[in-house]
Amino acid sequence: LFADLEGSTPLSRRLSTASYFSLARRLVRASDRCVIEAGGLVGRHAGDGVVAFFLAETCGSESAAARACIGAMRDLRGAIGDVAAASDLTPDKLTLRFGLHWGSTLYVGGITTSGRSEVTALGDEVNEAARIEACATGGRTLASKTLIERLDADDAAALDIDPDRMSYSVLGELSTADEKARRDAPAVAVCEL
């Protein structure tokens, strides 16, 4: 799961530095809570963005991990109203975009340097997930076909998703695809959730 606050630079200029920092802190806390409650691992934060991982080994199955990822996204999307209200903003001023992807060949592990610890993952799918998120402009959620197809019938039904009825687009052909998306993930099939 990759998530990022759209329009954060203009927002940071309109708010006082202290107010924007408080907003970023609230957003980080909300994202951590949603990811952890869903059974995921928070990888890292980059300003107002978050990277999280949902592992089949810890969630119980590939389907459970995919369900947890989608559930965390939905929970975080729902928490935006509270983050906005606590920051004296209307919810339409906080727009998150999400990229959800599945990687079967990822290497996930911890890195500790100078007392700082971070969970990270290595693999092509990490770059692809970042490109999916970057293309999800306008507060959209784009999920890869490989993630959606991990869902078994019960988990898909619980999420009110019918994988057989999903319509996909190729990432590199989206109007929102930038040079990096066309270079790193041109053939990744995605759908909007």
Language-model region placement:
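Hydrophobic alpha-helical membrane-association signature
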Residues: Y20-L27, A68-A72, L76, E125-E128
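Catalytic-site or vestigial catalytic-site microsegments of nucleotide-handling domains
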Residues: L1-P10
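Intrinsically disordered, glycine/charged-rich C-terminal tails and inter-domain linkers
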Residues: L106, S117, E128, T137-L193
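A generic structural signal for short hydrophobic patches within well-formed alpha-helices
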Residues: S8, V50, C59, L147-I148
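Conserved long alpha-helical elements within nucleotide-processing catalytic cores of c-di-GMP signaling
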Residues: T9-D32, G43-R44
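Catalytic core of nucleotidyl cyclases, primarily class III adenylyl/guanylyl cyclases
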Residues: A3, C34-R67, D82-D124
